[in-house]
Amino acid sequence: MIGFDNAGKRFGTLDAVKEFSMTIQDEEILGLLGPNGAGKTTLMLMMGTVYRPTSGKISVNGMDVVQHPNDVRKMIGIAFQDPRVDGILGAFDVLNWHLKMTTNLDKAQREDRVEKVLRAVDLWEARNKRTWLMSGGMRKKVEDCKVLAQRPKIAVFDEPTAFLDVPSRLLMWKMIRELRDGGSTVIVATNMMDEAERLSDRVAIVNLGRLVAIDTPEQLKGKTKGGEVLELTVGNGQEFPRECLAQFSEVQDVSQENNKVTVYLSGGRLLLPKIVETLTNRGVKIDSVHLKEVTLEDVFLNYTGHKLE
């Protein structure tokens, strides 16, 4: 278990992380979302003991990261957003050296594990190719494979599928899930909403260095002005009778801009015929009706201070 207890990190006069409290459960995949500069990378580097928190406390399996940095470091593997691989070495040697530094495996065990992970990501044939000659996607695979081969207790991935094509993205998600299923706790920082939703057990949203929301993707969508949005186009010049929708407990908010009316709902799909009937009986001329589900992107924009369109 990983715990952030009112943790903060300041660089000069800049508070990169502020009063941050969160618990990450064992053997879960936590997706970390936030705008650029929100503090996601700083959080991960504090967890990995690269940065020391300037306030509060961070613990990993009950150990304070400041008091027990070496013990914590042995449990964590980090795949960085920008691949940190020695360009002179080939992929095989990069991974073999990484395992030598981070595990107690013997030479045969290391080589066996490296071969398995390189074959899994379709890099075996390029195992001796110097990484500086590789494409960005191939280098990113090598970076991710360092953690996949290490199989740490806590695995941290910063934008794990950046530069990857669609088949490679799907494969990387599968391998990250398998890492979790093997007993690792996984943290994935990403700017891709589909990645966060399809990969994560829970999603944490960070904004301006603070935790603003954390829950399962479905629960987050359900909390964002209901799980669905009903968009109506009514006759020009009509004042929308909001009060007639007060009878429906599922209606959470109503807004109108000219002849465009937006109704935020929970359980709106089953409620739609009743709402249309009620409005028609009140003399509202409805020109069009569109029901859409709130997406994780909507949730993200809402929690980071952007207006949903």
List the model feature ranges, each with a label.
Residues M175-S266:
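ABC transporter nucleotide-binding domain
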Residues G56-D64, V72:
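Conserved ABC transporter NBD signature motif
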Residues G48:
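Helix-to-loop junction immediately C-terminal to a conserved catalytic motif
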Residues R130-G137:
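Conserved ABC ATPase signature
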Residues A155-D158:
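Catalytic Walker B motif of ABC-type/P-loop ATPase nucleotide-binding domains
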Residues N96, K100, A108-A126:
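Conserved ABC ATPase "signature" region
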